[in-house]
């Protein structure tokens, strides 16, 4: 063993190292732990794993009807194909059929009826995927059609809901509206969004002893998959182990939607005793899985001559699809964020969870918050246009204050408010005032091309609104060579969570992050995990890992104090070294001495978010631990002959507290902005009259590409503003808040179109603002301008 020991360093050399700073701890731009493997193709995803011997491939037959009774289901023809092992229907599920994540409503396979085009009716497992597909399509399925509900407005009018409606109220909105100097009503349709993760839904299951299963699943929620697989099989949770090393993207689409392939594979393995794998082709993935919730919004707003809100009522109708899924919490969050940055005063916010015969819509980055924010930003624009004011001035006038006008419609006080100072900084750095005047002059001289400019804020609440989910666990082992093994309950989907959590542990021990190995998220190492969602991954799991690391560090300090007979204050960890009074040791040497001293070098860690609560009956509380802030200023140019547009420039200022990793945080801000911009401009979901999704692949569903980026994109993180709350090293979440920065592009497009009517009217441009919708807005403004001119001419004609 002595041949493998590192060369001994003198005390002078160790002292020099000790005086240097750690280069890979918190606050450093450490590269993503898998970046080289991502670039080289060596990163292992589930479909890259070697197939198990005797493995089966699973394919599901999907419903072709939006709403129908199944009058005949015969899988006998499936067995005519050599290699078919089993054809499954709902009757073959040994345990619980329903896999609804919160409340029932999601059968694994259709049971007597289908409720959307794309619902899984049966599944076939065979030696090859192609054989399974052919066999599944050979099954005989006959239907009796029922009347579908495909439109969210129809569902709202019929009160066709998956869950009860909910209301937030503060003050007297009816009286305030009645007494307001000005009043506007309007409606808005907000489209959904496909997650379009690069890796489609996939699971691979290996049966183990005693009826257990090892499940390799691309999921944001390993514990939920564990629970549902166990319930589908009728076994206890401890028989099921979920292993999740990395996902090829998630964005919320693998929070609940990943469970069905895992459960189907588990049922196949249960019946056959053979391993099974299911990977959805892109088209089937888009047909089966839910999207971001489309919303229909109705509003009634009262305001004064300056644009200050007096009273408001907003009705938010979320298109939930055929089942509840997570729609209760998603519509709740839309309601929570229907204020965005603004003090609503007297407000009534109603949230409706509408049932339609489409795929069950689900979590997506922002989790309903973006839809609520789009609604209030539409209102701010409409108020400003009606008064002939710059929308930014109306926005600033209605911002939450620091010591007054600072209570939300759900009765949480907005603390540590950075909105005004961030807006002022971005106004100055983006030269908003100068560019606004230049754009007005450009538009006056340009009959076809029109420019638009908008600066919009973001105030996003951080925490799961289901309060019990705000907890996390971690597990750390230190080996006698000084290397560290880390597991936590979060899941890596490319966002850099593992890198940040490793940096947290590196900071605690003051060692290089290269010493730390993070392996797959695994339910038999860290149990009872919360989903990696709600921007909470680092906040929760980083804190849990910090807790575990500090527990071990405390043991090491106590041991060193005893062993070297010094006080604990004489012991300091720094840059891979430990100073014990005058003695300096490499970190690994202290670890070895502690091992010989019979000190435990392993620890679990746990964290739960403090201060938060929400009383749903009273519709009040503090659902969010803190708010993350941001602002974006976007400039666009619109061709009024075609409705086409380009993004010219975007300036972003975003609040991440004390950044754990500036490079990763800037990447998240850039990516979030582009994804939000895509949702509001080009990502259009289209269903035909029979409820079939027609945009079910990249040929018909467009996501932003390189050419769609702003020609000039400037991103800055807010400096010297650590999070006042006791988060992990006073950082802030950065997963979801930047998504809403894309709203600035949508508002800028509307600003350009509004110039056609001298900025005195709000164009009716629903989201996404496709060129077709923009052209409709252009024609609306031109007709309005012509009518205004005609009325003016009539007014000056002699009697």
Report residues per predicted region.
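Helix-loop-helix junctions that connect adjacent transmembrane helices in secondary transporters/permeases
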Residues: 153-233, 399-483, 694-708, 712-717
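Phosphate/diphosphate-binding loops
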Residues: 127, 274-320, 543-572, 576
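C-terminal catalytic domains of large/alpha subunits in multi-subunit enzymes
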Residues: 4-7, 90-91, 234-239, 269-276, ...
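Flexible, low-hydrophobicity surface segments
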Residues: 1-165, 183, 271
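Glycine-rich loop/linker segments at domain edges
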Residues: 28, 34-41, 167-203, 294-379, ...
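Short beta-strand elements
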Residues: 43, 202-207, 296-305, 311-316, ...
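Short acidic, glycine/serine/threonine-rich loops at helix termini
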Residues: 97-102, 135-138, 217, 226-228, ...
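Thiamine diphosphate
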Residues: 248-273, 277-279, 497-505
